[in-house]
Amino acid sequence: MAAFTLWILVLNVFLLGFQARKLASNLKFPIQKCDDSTPQKNFNSFLWLVKRTPPAYFYGTIHVPYTRVWDFIPMNSKQAFTASQHVYFELDLTDEKTMRALMKCQMLPSGTMLRQTLPRKMFKRLKSHLRYIKRMIPKWIKHRDQETSSAGPYANKLYEMLTKDWDKKRPIWVMLMVNSLTESDIKTRGIPVLDQYLALEASRNHKLIGAVENVDEQCKPLNALNASQVVFALNQSLHFQERLRRGQVQVTYTTDDLIDHYNCGDLKSVLFSTQTSLPTLTVNSSLEQRERKRAQEIDQYFRNELIFQRNKRMAQRVITLLNNHPEKDFFFAFGAGHFLGNHSIIDIMKKHGYDVEYVKPEQELPSFKAKKSLNTRRERRKGCRGRRKKSKRCQKKKKRKRPDYSRVRLLQVATRRWNPTRKPYPTKLSEAPGARDISSRKAAASCTPIWTVSLALTCAVTCLLTYSGFR
C-alpha cells in the first residue's frame, strides 16, 4: 500500500469523524461519467515527460483495482510504459523481501499484544466491529458465488486473510485495516491495484524493475506517532464506523467517485480539497476544541512527513538515476498525489533545471527505439560474445573469483560416516539389509540415509561460501 494512500485514509478518518454532514456539502464536485464512447481527448492524463534523450516519464497511479481504470488510461500513457525498459516504483511490490519487511513493520515488538496498548473499552469495540465484518462478508460476496454453501468457506478464509494477526499489529495499522474493511473494497479483493498491475506487467515483459524508497522510509513516519495520537485516531475511526453501521452517517464521497475523477475528471480538485484544512467545528466545547487541535497536529505531521519530505527524497533519487544513467530510458510510476499541488516532484525537478512537460491524452510521444532488455539469462549470456568480450563489463565478469570448492570437499570428508567395507549406502528399500523381512523393511524405510543429511549440509555451506564473496 502506498504511503500516500495511507495518509489520505488517515486524514479522511478525521474529517468524517468530526463532521460528516458538513463535509458532504464541501465535497460536492461535478463528477463526469466516462464510458467506452467517450473521446480520447476527454480522458484525464497523468503523464509527464522529462525532455532528454532517451526520454523519461512520470506517471501518476491510483490505489484502486486496475480493471476500473485501465480502459480509460490514454493510449500514449500505455505506449510510454511499453517503450520504457526501466520501470521504477515507490516500492518494488514484486520483491518477496519487500513484502516480508512490510509485514514486519506493522507488528508490535515481540511479546506485546494489542490489548496491552489500547484501553479496555476500545479493544472491546474493535473486537465487536470485526465480528460484524465477519458476519457481513458472506453477504457482500454473494455476487461471486451463487451458492451459499460455497460462499461460506471462502468468506471465512477471506476474513482470516484480511485480519491475520490483527491482535499483534500496531494500532495505526489496525486503524488502516479497519478503514479498508468496506463492502466495495472486499468485493474487489484479489484484483491487483493499478501500480501492482504495472509491476506485474513489467516483470512479465522482462523490464528492469526498481524502487526509489525502502520499507523503513514508508513505515517510520506512521510508527513514529506517539501512543495518545494513535489511540485518538483509532477512536475516531471506530466512532465513524459505528455511526455508519447504525445509519447515523452516510459516505458522500466514495471510491467510485474518486475513480470517475481519475478516469475523466480533475483529480487535483478532489485530492487537495480534502487536504487543505479540517472543517470548522460549530460546537465550542472544550473537549471538541482539544480534539480539533490534536487532529490538526496529526494532519500537519502527515502532510510534512508523507508528502513533502517524501517528494524531496524521491525527486532527489530520480535526479541521481537520470544523472548516473544518461543512456537509459525510465518510467517512474508513483502515486498521483506526488505530482500535484505545491512542492510536488514536478516542481522540484523544474527547480533543478529539468524540462518537465505535461503530456496531453492525444499528444504524440518523442520517437525513440529502446535497446533490447538484457534481463533474461539467455540474453545476458549473449552480451559477452564476439567483439563485446573486450568491454569493461565483460572483463569484470572474467575477473570474478570462482567458489572455493576445496572447503566443501573437506567438509564432505569430515561429515562422512566411517564405512569399513567401502560399500555404497543403500538408497533403495530392496537393497537394505534385512529387506526380506516386513518389519525390517519398515525400519529401513524409517531410517534417514546418511547421505541425505550430508547433502543438505553441503548445499548450505556451498550457498554460504558463494554469497560470502568466494567468487
Curated annotation (Swiss-Prot):
<keyword id="KW-1133">Transmembrane helix</keyword>
<feature type="glycosylation site" description="N-linked (GlcNAc...) asparagine">
    <location>
        <position position="226"/>
    </location>
</feature>
<feature type="glycosylation site" description="N-linked (GlcNAc...) asparagine">
    <location>
        <position position="235"/>
    </location>
</feature>
<feature type="compositionally biased region" description="Basic residues">
    <location>
        <begin position="369"/>
        <end position="402"/>
    </location>
</feature>
<keyword id="KW-0812">Transmembrane</keyword>
<keyword id="KW-0732">Signal</keyword>
<keyword id="KW-0472">Membrane</keyword>
<keyword id="KW-0378">Hydrolase</keyword>
<feature type="signal peptide">
    <location>
        <begin position="1"/>
        <end position="24"/>
    </location>
</feature>
<keyword id="KW-0325">Glycoprotein</keyword>
<feature type="transmembrane region" description="Helical">
    <location>
        <begin position="450"/>
        <end position="470"/>
    </location>
</feature>
<dbReference type="GO" id="GO:0004222">
    <property type="term" value="F:metalloendopeptidase activity"/>
</dbReference>
<protein>
    <recommendedName>
        <fullName>Metalloprotease TIKI homolog</fullName>
        <ecNumber>3.4.-.-</ecNumber>
    </recommendedName>
</protein>
<feature type="glycosylation site" description="N-linked (GlcNAc...) asparagine">
    <location>
        <position position="284"/>
    </location>
</feature>
<dbReference type="GO" id="GO:0030178">
    <property type="term" value="P:negative regulation of Wnt signaling pathway"/>
</dbReference>
<dbReference type="Pfam" id="PF01963">
    <property type="entry name" value="TraB_PrgY_gumN"/>
</dbReference>
<feature type="region of interest" description="Disordered">
    <location>
        <begin position="369"/>
        <end position="406"/>
    </location>
</feature>
<comment type="function">
    <text>Metalloprotease.</text>
</comment>
<dbReference type="GO" id="GO:0016020">
    <property type="term" value="C:membrane"/>
</dbReference>
<dbReference type="GO" id="GO:0006508">
    <property type="term" value="P:proteolysis"/>
</dbReference>
<dbReference type="GO" id="GO:0046872">
    <property type="term" value="F:metal ion binding"/>
</dbReference>
<keyword id="KW-0479">Metal-binding</keyword>
<feature type="topological domain" description="Extracellular">
    <location>
        <begin position="25"/>
        <end position="449"/>
    </location>
</feature>
<dbReference type="InterPro" id="IPR002816">
    <property type="entry name" value="TraB/PrgY/GumN_fam"/>
</dbReference>
<comment type="similarity">
    <text>Belongs to the TIKI family.</text>
</comment>
<keyword id="KW-0645">Protease</keyword>
<dbReference type="InterPro" id="IPR040230">
    <property type="entry name" value="TIKI1/2-like"/>
</dbReference>
<keyword id="KW-0482">Metalloprotease</keyword>
<feature type="topological domain" description="Cytoplasmic">
    <location>
        <position position="471"/>
    </location>
</feature>
<feature type="glycosylation site" description="N-linked (GlcNAc...) asparagine">
    <location>
        <position position="342"/>
    </location>
</feature>
